[in-house]
Amino acid sequence: MAHDLEVVEEKITVTERRHSVIEAPEIGRLIEALSRRGYEVFGPTVRDGAIVYDRIESAVGLPRGWTDEQEPGRYRLKRRQDEALFGYVVGPQSLKRYLHPPEVRLFSAEKQNGTFRILNNETKPQRPFAFLGVRACELEAVAVQDRVLLEDKYLDPIYRQRRSGAFVVAVQCTLAAKTCFCASMGTGPRARAGFDLALTELVGEGGHRFVVEAGSERGAEVIGELQSVPATDTDLQKAEAAVDAAARQQVRAIDTAGIKELLYQNFDHPRWDDVAGRCLSCANCTMVCPTCFCTTVEDVTDVTGEHAERWRRWDSCFTLGFSYIHGGNVRNSSKARYRQWMTHKLASWMDQFGRSGCVGCGRCITWCPAGIDITEEVRAIREGQDHGKP
């Protein structure tokens, strides 16, 4: 299979999409089919007390029978009463870790005869990626990063190399965590685009099956290699009902009406002081956020000074050094840094990229050690917005 496929594959229109049903054992054969086609397959697995993306070669490593419990500042795994393969919501990782990695060596240099010789480093993966278990909010996050790193004025060649030709197997959410709010953001829980295949897991008296939707021609080709039967109207109704139930389970929401103007008009709201008293500026929220894209560049040398490397690493607007310029730091308080992050995510992102930078995954709530809840911060500002006006 060619490794230089364009990022945007030819998709099947909604009216042409084909639905089929496969039994649970076919998931292992799906992984094998993707491997045969030359993909390096990544999927969910349990590691260090969390469900994370990692390289998989079979269905054995999937989180069978596990679910997650999430609340502000809390994440725990627990056993389910069934053998669901995807019976969880989201872990701390997203596809950002693979498409826009935490660190990448840009180039290295060696000193020879008194001068440095630049050595370019290969940043393109040896095989294209295939991702299994991608949620609707994560698909939306990839679309956001595409807009930022591929479609903006400055194209990121490293992101393009890693994004190109990626095969995406989405999994429709059939349950929600207490920190999810994708329904209010219009980003889930149903995946509607951006996938090659979408699975809806049905576990119950009817057995353990998956309703499969082909979102691209190559997705349909892969399903053709598996044992499947056409989905009936009853199958489709059950799948739709399961996803609708996940939307109803969500207990958090952001009222997005006029949110850009709301935040722009409330720079001096007392809530910013309140949240600053709780924020640790640890940058957890930006590390787990699937859309945050800020990086820094560092040059390192060995002790002899004969070898040097330039690395690009994730950075965060919560660190003091991020906003340091000649003469001082323009955001030297937790108040200023949190306000910058939330206002950018929910307001100025729209001016830059034409859409919100938040997909409602709830990771910033779950993984904040102080339990700060972005939905509550927005609500507090909206309810007391007169305080922020001059």
For every predicted segment, state its role.
Residues 2-264, 269-272, 303:
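Iron-sulfur-associated redox domains of electron-transfer enzymes in respiratory
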Residues 26-30, 285, 313, 373:
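General structural feature for long, well-ordered alpha-helical segments within catalytic domains
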Residues 37, 282, 361:
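Single, functionally critical "micro-switch" positions that shape active/binding sites
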Residues 40, 285, 364:
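Residue-level detector of anion-binding/catalytic polar loops
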Residues 142, 290-294, 369:
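Active-site-flanking alpha-helical
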Residues 256-277, 295-390:
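Ferredoxin-type iron-sulfur electron-transfer modules in oxidoreductases and energy-metabolism complexes
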Residues 284-300:
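A donor-sugar binding/catalytic signature common to diverse glycosyltransferases
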